[in-house]
Amino acid sequence: AVCESDRRDAIALYTGNDDNIVVDLLTRYRIMVGNKPVEKSIVGGLLGHWAVWTRSAVEIFEKVRAVREKGEGIPHEMLTLAAQVTDMNAAIFDPQGGFRGSIAGVHEVLRRQGLLEGIWCLNPNETLSPGQAEEITRVTSAYPHLVDDEFVRAHLDEWLK
């Protein structure tokens, strides 16, 4: 529908698809409108990472933009990165638990970084799903290059003043 609009060049597309977010950002969508191909790219996203690992999200987004602007295809390491980001988002947002632990998952990462004292939610029944804390530990250990823990530690005192 966006590609068929006369205002398509004024419309920015964003993705919140945590199952495939890096690939969404890398993809140039080509849709036939009448007899002409119209191309449109998603210009932003990485919602899971923006919630807890913002510095890493910026770095990922810059890599994605550089690859997309080069226009020479998608390097294998970007597909590996895509799978890693998807794995991390699954740990935080809890699709295995029907997304019941989404807010608590974000809070848990922020608590581990020292930015929150606990993972309390407005609804006291909203908490981590069974095994979710272990999943968060697993992904932060498996992909230390995608977390901001050292950066947060370096600035925590300054930010909490």
Language-model features and meaning:
Residues 1-102:
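Catalytic alpha/beta core domains of metabolic enzymes, predominantly
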Residues 97-100, 109-161:
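Long, low-complexity C-terminal extensions of enzymes
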